[in-house]
Curated annotation (Swiss-Prot):
The gene is rsgA. This is Small ribosomal subunit biogenesis GTPase RsgA. It comes from Streptomyces coelicolor (strain ATCC BAA-471 / A3(2) / M145). The lineage of its organism: Bacteria, Bacillati, Actinomycetota, Actinomycetes, Kitasatosporales. It comes from the Bacteria. Its cofactor is Zn(2+). Keywords: Cytoplasm, GTP-binding, Hydrolase, Metal-binding, Nucleotide-binding, Ribosome biogenesis, RNA-binding, rRNA-binding, Zinc.
Length: 366
């Protein structure tokens, strides 16, 4: 690829996050005549890729491994064939970050939701009672991904009393230490300028339950009706999720937004570091425990239990921490067991091939 075309790629793709480091990583594929692009949508073995020539439809048959964490996903930077019908994605560049969840708390398979994300925006609706444990779960996955989390309290116009709103923000802040908490009303435009400033210049993934107001929030940030939004039920102010695929869109003020479907299940997947980050105050207290392997159950000299007794640490936080750690440990154990089973299966397959070859060889010597 010539320096002129390389400069053209940089200019055309910069609004989607392309930079010099991505260009350096892509250099070997540019030498092969492949085009750089970013995946904006994945659908049934194909994907839409934005390139310097516009959005192209490409087949992912060459990058569809058995490992679900290595499939092409929204946010990936890929190398695409310059022509062909169909044209193919040949590879994707190593990911800087990846947002991964477990497909089920009872299974060990992971599902990658978005790649190369800088900000993980967790949308939480104020139209319903706050579920702090679920917020902590989302934040654990966000921290584990490598992205910077942000909690956005949507539909803030439904809480007109500023004192009540301040208490709700404070409640969420206790479940999200070190994470900005921003009340927003897309209907009234409140808080949108602050949110737009936070996510500008990077890639943000928008996460949350069905009806959390993600599509309305995405439309407000985009300044257009890019997402299909269903009517909200007047009886309770709840919405119904409308985004059915993960879409990547350039924001008018800079930055890129990945909108995701409403997530009913948010299972952890090897997110131990993320859990520790969410409950950082428990980790700090644990350093003061008398025993280094203190389980914070009934041990003497436990600083965590002492903090609960004094009211410095809500008991709910410790219970939530224990629950998430137990779940994560189960998933890790199952993942390790599945990996060992796959290795044994491969050994048996190779052994069968070797046995067949030996029998064929012996038969030829008779």
């Amino acid at each position: 690829m010539t320096s002129t075309s390389s400069h053209s790629n940089h200019s055309a793709l910069s609004s989607y996050g392309w930079d010099d480091s991505w260009a350096d990583a892509f250099a070997p594929y540019a030498a092969e005549g492949l085009l750089p692009g970013r995946v904006v949508r994945v659908d049934r073995g194909q994907c839409d890729v934005v390139t310097a020539d516009g959005v192209l439809r490409a087949d992912t048959a060459f990058v569809t491994p058995h490992d679900p964490l290595r499939v092409v996903c929204t946010g990936d930077w890929v190398a695409v064939e310059p022509g062909g019908n169909p044209r193919y994605v040949r590879t994707y560049l190593p990911r800087r970050t990846a947002f991964v969840r477990s497909t089920s708390s009872k299974r060990s398979e992971g599902q990658i939701l978005a790649a190369n994300v800088d900000h993980a925006v967790v949308a939480v609706s104020l139209a319903v009672e706050l579920d702090l444990a679920r917020i902590e779960r989302f934040l654990a996955l966000a921290w584990e991904s490598g992205a910077q989390p942000l909690v956005v309290l949507t539909k803030a116009d439904l809480v007109p009393d500023p004192v009540t709103l301040a208490y709700l923000v404070q409640d969420v802040e206790t479940a999200a230490p070190g994470v900005p908490v921003l009340p927003v009303s897309a209907e009234q435009g409140e808080g949108l300028d602050v949110l737009a400033a936070v996510v500008s210049g990077g890639t943000a993934v928008l996460l949350g339950q069905s009806g959390a107001g993600k599509s309305t929030l995405a439309n407000a940030l985009l300044g257009e009706a890019a997402m299909d939004v269903q009517a909200i039920r007047d009886v309770d102010g709840k919405g119904r999720h409308t985004t059915t695929t993960r879409n990547l869109l350039a924001l008018p003020g800079g930055g890129v937004l990945i909108d995701t479907p409403g997530l009913r299940g948010v299972g952890l997947f090897d997110a131990g570091n993320g859990v520790d980050q969410v409950f950082a105050e428990i980790a700090e207290l644990a350093e003061e425990c008398r025993f280094h392997d203190c389980a914070h159950e009934s041990e003497p000299g436990c600083a965590v239990l002492a903090a609960i007794d004094s009211g410095a640490l809500p008991e709910r936080r410790l219970e939530s921490y224990r629950k998430l750690m137990r779940e994560n440990q189960r998933i890790v154990a199952k993942t390790d067991a599945r990996a060992r089973a796959e290795i044994r299966k491969e050994y048996k397959r190779r052994g069968a091939i070797g046995k067949a070859a030996m029998e064929a060889k012996r038969g030829g010597l008779r």
